[in-house]
Swiss-Prot record:
UniProt-recorded name of the protein: High frequency lysogenization protein HflD homolog
Topology in membrane: Peripheral membrane protein
Organism: Shewanella oneidensis (strain ATCC 700550 / JCM 31522 / CIP 106686 / LMG 19005 / NCIMB 14063 / MR-1)
GO CC term, one of those recorded: cytoplasm
Location, primary (coarse class): cytoplasm
Pfam assignment, any one: DUF489
Cellular location(s): Cytoplasm; Cell inner membrane
Source lineage: Bacteria, Pseudomonadati, Pseudomonadota, Gammaproteobacteria, Alteromonadales
C-alpha cells in the first residue's frame, strides 16, 4: 500500500469521523464517549513522529473509513449534509493556513488544554468548553460560519453546542494533517478510486 496515500486517507477518515459525530449530536443531542474522546485527542497531538500517532485509537477510525467509502463511492449512502460540512471545514483550513497569528494562537491555546489534562479527562465538560472556545475564538472567525442543521431542542443545549464546536476543531486538526500530507480537493475527484481502494484495505487491517 502506498504509504503517503494511506496516511492521507487516514487523515481524511479522521475529518469525516469528527463531522459525522457533529451531525449525530445535532440530531440526537448525545454522543458516543469513546468516539468523542478519540476525535478530541487528535487535537492535542501537535508534534507527531508519524501521521499514525495522531490517531492512537486505530479501531476508532473504522467508522471514518466507512464514511470515506460512503461519501466517495458510487453509493446511495452519500450524505449531502456531511459533504456540506466537509467543504466548510476544508475552506476554513485554507484560511487558517494563511493566518500566522491564527496558527500561533491555536498552538498556545492547545498547549493550555494539554496542561489541563493533568487534572481532567478529555471528555470533561470544562475541557470540552475550552476546546469549543478555541474553535469559536480562532477558527470560526476566519471565514463563513458552518451552519449546523439538526433538532432545535438539542442545538439549544450549551453542552451540545460546545461538543459540536470541539468536534469541528477535531475535524480541522485532521484537515490540517491531510493538507500537510499533500491532500487537495481535486484528489477527491481525480484520485477517488485510489482513495476508495486504500480505505477498503484499511478497513480489513
Amino acid at each position: 500500500m502506498n504509504e503517503q496515500l494511506h496516511n492521507r486517507t487516514m487523515a481524511f477518515a479522521g475529518i469525516l469521523q469528527a463531522i459525522a459525530q457533529v451531525q449525530y449530536l445535532a440530531r440526537h443531542g448525545e454522543s458516543d464517549t469513546d468516539e468523542l474522546a478519540a476525535s478530541l485527542h487528535t487535537i492535542l497531538v501537535t508534534d507527531p513522529e508519524t501521521p499514525a500517532d495522531v490517531y492512537q485509537d486505530k479501531a476508532g477510525l473504522h467508522k471514518g473509513y466507512q464514511l470515506v467509502l460512503n461519501q466517495l463511492g458510487d453509493s446511495s449512502q452519500k450524505d449531502v449534509e456531511i459533504t456540506r460540512y466537509l467543504v466548510g471545514i476544508l475552506a476554513l483550513e485554507r484560511k487558517l493556513a494563511r493566518s500566522n497569528s491564527g496558527l500561533s494562537m491555536l498552538a498556545e491555546r492547545i498547549n493550555q488544554v494539554n496542561r489541563q489534562l493533568h487534572h481532567f479527562a478529555i471528555t470533561d465538560e470544562q475541557v470540552i468548553a475550552n476546546l469549543a472556545s478555541i474553535y469559536s475564538d480562532i477558527i470560526s472567525n476566519l471565514g463563513p460560519k458552518i451552519q449546523i442543521s439538526g433538532n432545535p431542542l438539542c442545538l439549544q443545549r450549551p453542552i451540545v453546542q460546545q461538543k459540536i464546536r470541539a468536534l469541528l476543531l477535531a475535524a480541522m486538526r485532521s484537515a490540517v494533517l491531510w493538507r500537510q500530507l499533500g491532500g487537495k480537493r481535486r484528489h477527491l475527484v481525480f484520485a477517488r478510486k485510489a482513495i476508495l481502494d486504500t480505505a477498503k484495505k484499511s478497513l480489513t487491517l
